[in-house]
């Protein structure tokens, strides 16, 4: 919430406390709590404009270490994502889900944790890369109406995002 306060104070015309009162933040500590929080979104979805799940695969990564059946952990993630997708369609709700990546030892490339499951269920996929100096690049990898490959470079600053030149 500290970052939210910083952005709201710098950008918002509304009172920061009034804006904060419209947020619902749930801090979860394990996969079960995450699943419960996702289920609980049904209770307020019709009044919400946006739901953010950051990161959908954080606990999946921990679960699959001790899970002999990696598929069950991934199915649990997929159920959470499909529940949010269902609410998004029913209530015209924006849903943002972040994912973690890992370096594939065979190709030495970053791959999404959980494979293609999240990509399959997502309407849009944006890859964000970090460069020296705090610069970042957001690249559109999947979208229902736009071609993949469009990108924008930016830097996170005190009052939001700032566009940067094309060199990383």
Name each model-derived stretch.
Residues 17, 31, 35-38, 71-82, ...:
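Amphipathic alpha-helical transducer elements in NTP-driven molecular machines
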Residues 53-83, 93, 100-101:
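Conserved P-loop NTPase nucleotide-binding/switch module
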Residues 86-168:
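Phosphate-binding/switch region of NTP-binding enzymes
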């Amino acid at each position: 919430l500290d970052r939210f306060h910083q952005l709201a104070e710098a950008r918002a015309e509304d009172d920061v406390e009034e804006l904060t009162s419209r947020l619902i933040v749930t801090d979860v500590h394990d996969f079960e709590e995450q699943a419960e929080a996702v289920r609980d979104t049904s209770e307020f979805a019709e009044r919400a404009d946006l739901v953010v799940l950051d990161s959908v695969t954080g606990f999946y990564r921990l679960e699959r270490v001790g899970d002999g059946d990696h598929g069950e952990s991934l199915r649990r993630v997929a159920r959470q994502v499909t529940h949010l997708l269902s609410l998004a369609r029913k209530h015209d709700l924006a849903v943002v889900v972040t994912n973690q990546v890992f370096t594939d030892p065979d190709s030495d490339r970053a791959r999404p944790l959980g494979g293609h499951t999240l990509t399959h269920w997502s309407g849009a996929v944006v890859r964000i890369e970090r460069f020296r100096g705090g610069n970042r690049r957001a690249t559109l990898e999947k979208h229902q109406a736009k071609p993949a490959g469009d990108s924008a470079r930016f830097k996170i600053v005190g009052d939001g995002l700032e566009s940067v030149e094309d060199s990383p």
